[in-house]
């Protein structure tokens, strides 16, 4: 699966999902949120994955939060809500 805003990699028994927008301190957009949700779904279905690790690319920030250019949009809020629901219902540990 190809992603634009995140990196997805499986190593040993864990999946690393990294927000890959270091120029904006990994601030997320609706696309980022959609991709994060999709990557969580892939990791959750993968029998080889026991743990999911969320991280941020670069060395300045894990994630600065929502991209201010999108944060007030209904689309952003809907995707953020769906992602948070998926985080809480995921059957695998998330670090």
Where are these regions (language model features)?
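A short, small-residue-rich loop immediately preceding and capping a beta-strand
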Residues: 92-95
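Glycine- (often His-adjacent) and acidic-residue-rich active-site loop
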Residues: 48, 56-90
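Conserved CoA-thioester-binding segment of acyl-CoA-metabolizing enzymes
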Residues: 1-55
């Amino acid at each position: 699966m190809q992603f634009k805003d995140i990196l997805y990699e499986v190593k040993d028994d864990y999946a690393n999902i990294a927000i890959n927008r270091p120029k904006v301190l990994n601030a997320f957009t609706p696309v980022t949120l959609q991709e994060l949700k999709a990557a969580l779904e892939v990791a959750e279905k993968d029998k080889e994955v026991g743990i999911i690790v969320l991280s941020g690319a670069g060395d300045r920030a894990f994630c600065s939060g929502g991209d201010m250019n999108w944060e007030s949009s209904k689309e952003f809020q809907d995707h953020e809500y769906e992602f948070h629901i998926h985080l809480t219902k995921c059957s695998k540990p998330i670090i």
